[in-house]
């Protein structure tokens, strides 16, 4: 729920990455969520240093959304622990440091664009009009402030949801399929903005099932059937799988049933932190 500056020149990658020894911004320890006999999230471990973009990559139904809901404290875990900025989740007090763009449009259809944005921003004490207008400029809705959300196209509603998720300048940002329904040109602007946020120290966790966006992430977590199959930078994952194609790499890890294996990968660091 949120805001930031309008797009600047394209950024190819986050600037200087913080060291892997930085205190994790997001942690999961043996995190599990069951729905009856189904293990939607099955023993996930991760420790994500700040200032990077992490991609949760997997097919629909792989557990990405459930994992995000556990990390944000919006769902209760069957077992295990989740922490954001060192605080055990769920934590009402910690929500002000978190931005969350849901997979479905988390806005009120009867309210206007401006009313939606100011409502969500006010929940976190953000009332600066100039800042909020910059949010709408970023998503190209600044000329539609009075339009009821119900009259927006699906892509416009997604853009409004993003503006609401970023309006309070959160330190940790969870984006669940943020570019679905967004035109290609605006999608590039979004990713440029994500990289600027990470360069300024924010931590972004972005879920997607679209492989062609994966190379824009600093690190990936391949997820299937509630398990983290592998973690690492896109080039590292391709090299380990012996392919130039990330989709092929994902399928090979899924077929082999591999677990996160590279030294220093997010999931591995979580296990180290518990020893």
Regions found by a protein language model. Give the residues of each.
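Conserved ABC transporter NBD signature motif
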Residues: 80-96
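Conserved ABC ATPase "signature" region
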Residues: 118, 122, 129-144
């Amino acid at each position: 729920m949120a805001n930031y500056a309008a797009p600047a020149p394209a950024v190819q990658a986050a600037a200087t990455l913080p060291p892997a020894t930085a205190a994790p911004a997001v942690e999961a320890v043996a995190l599990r969520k069951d729905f009856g006999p189904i293990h939607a999230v099955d023993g996930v471990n991760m420790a994500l240093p700040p200032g990077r973009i992490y991609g949760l990559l997997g097919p629909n139904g792989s557990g990405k959304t459930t994992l995000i809901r556990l990390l944000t404290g919006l769902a209760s875990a069957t077992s295990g622990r989740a922490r954001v900025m060192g605080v055990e989740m769920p934590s009402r007090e910690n929500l002000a440091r978190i931005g969350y763009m849901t997979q479905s449009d988390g806005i009120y259809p009867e309210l206007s664009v401006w009313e939606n944005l100011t409502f969500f921003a006010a929940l976190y004490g953000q009332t600066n009009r100039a800042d909020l207008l910059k949010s709408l400029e970023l998503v190209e809705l600044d000329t539609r402030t009075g339009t009821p959300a119900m009259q927006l196209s699906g892509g416009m509603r997604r853009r409004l949801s993003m503006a609401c998720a970023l309006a309070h300048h959160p330190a940790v940002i969870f984006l669940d399929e943020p570019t679905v329904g967004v035109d290609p040109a605006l999608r590039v602007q979004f990713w440029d903005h994500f990289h600027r946020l990470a360069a300024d120290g924010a931590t972004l966790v972005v879920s997607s099932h679209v492989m062609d966006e994966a190379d824009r992430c600093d690190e990936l977590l391949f997820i299937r059937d509630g398990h983290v199959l592998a973690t690492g930078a896109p080039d590292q994952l391709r090299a380990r799988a012996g392919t130039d194609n990330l989709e092929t790499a994902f399928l090979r890890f899924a077929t082999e049933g591999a677990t996160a294996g590279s030294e220093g990968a997010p999931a591995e660091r979580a296990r180290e932190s518990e020893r």
